[in-house]
Amino acid sequence: MKETLQKLRTDLIPIYGKGESDAIIRLIFHYLKGWNLTDMLIHQDDELSPFMKDEIDKILARLLKMEPIQYITGEARFHGMDLVVRPGVLIPRPETDELVDIIIDENKDREDLSVLDVCTGSGCIAIALARNLPFSKVTALDFSKEAIAVALENVQKTKTHVRIIEQDIFNWDPAEKYDIIVSNPPYVLDSEALTMEKNVLDYEPHEALFVRDDNPLAYYRRIAEIAKKALENNGKLYFEINPLKAVELEEMLKKMGFEKVETYRDSYGKLRFLKAEL
């Protein structure tokens, strides 16, 4: 096994760096063997079977083409859960995990909350909130059939109660009221693609990532319009945002009638989250 580990590190570190390479290697062995880091240390002197070596070689070949490890294994870790992900559905990010923590921390003492997650993707936000907000009723929307299928799988896998609905928000008039509306919509500017990693550009769904430079707040504007109709009194709107557009978004929401608008920084110090109340 030591030789295999050394080969993985030798091939991956020049592309991914040491920290990410080590994380990828742990994911490979968790996927193939169910091992954690302690298990890897215990078995480091073991001889891997020819079958296992062949499987690792296949995974390595895909990684060298910059395919995300989450699409290779079909899983992504999010908020303590192993969620299903597939090509066509955005891989959950650590920053989104931070957004979930903010929402839980600010609403943990409230019960029977009605929650709407817009642009749910894999369902990661909706499922994490359903698991952590007591007796909450959670609904999740997406227009993508691929996302809806994956979100439904994740609801079943995690045994959570989340209603998943296929819906284009630009052609939707909400009939229900919600205490919390949350969204991590597409927010990366088309022009930012020039500086993005190849594994994101070549494999992840562009429609879940990018917005036009000449209309960067389109999703936020529409979701805010929905929130004005659908938020209960004292309801809260939460967004994950593009730091480049934080000030512009805050100004837009205030003009739309949201009086309490607050931004939060992520663990890297970037303005990444926003809360608004009417």
Regions found by a protein language model. Give the residues of each.
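Conserved SAM/SAH cofactor-binding pocket of Class I
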Residues: E95-T195, R222
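Short loop/edge segments at beta-strand edges and connector loops
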Residues: T73, I165-Q167, I241, R265
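Conserved Class I SAM-dependent methyltransferase catalytic core
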Residues: V84, D213-E277
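Conserved AdoMet
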Residues: H30-D105
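Conserved hydrophobic residues forming the short capping helix/wall of the S-adenosyl-L-methionine
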Residues: L12, N107, V155, A227, ...
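Mobile active-site "lid"/loop adjacent to the S-adenosyl-L-methionine
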Residues: Y187-Y219
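Non-catalytic accessory regions of SAM-dependent methyltransferases
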Residues: M1-L41
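Conserved beta-strand segments of alpha/beta enzyme cores
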Residues: D82, K137, H161-R163, E259-E262
